[in-house]
Amino acid sequence: VNARRITPAAYLEELKARGIPALRVGRSAVMLESPLPVKDIPGFSEGIVSVQDAGTQLAAEILAPQKNEQILDACAAPGGKTAHLLESADCHVTALEIDPKRAELIKSTLLRLRVEATVRAADAAMVSEWHSGREFDAILLDAPCTASGIVRRQPDVPWSRRPEDPARLAREQERLLNALWPLVKK
């Protein structure tokens, strides 16, 4: 639920009035008892709500952004975590995505939700190409991984992986962490 637009309690009332059973999950989420196509979820196209896994939503809650903080969301596409950070506090987020098409996806997500961030298509590890020199209060890095955590939703994931993927992805994660760690305020 986009906290800048509606409370979870008010959204639950709206769903109830439409005959859509749902329940509150955590501090800011609502779960429909039966799935609906995204286009049929009340308020989705208007930016009132987003669709996210419960685990994904925890990223913003754990980071707990504060007013005026500078936050970097690296490897940010499709923009759900970026948006959730911005919905949680009046903070400033820089969202990086290496793929320009996926960076555009972040922009469209933020536009739909009526929140603003600085979105850049850049390799997060190539700091000199995108960084202004300002330190960040926090960094959210959802580094490329084997996607083993989404097998429940996408059972074909194990079949699309190669034996060398874990080692290759671990090197990429290390490269990103080593590049970004120095940008956090001491």
Name each region found by the language model.
Residues V1-K186:
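S-adenosylmethionine
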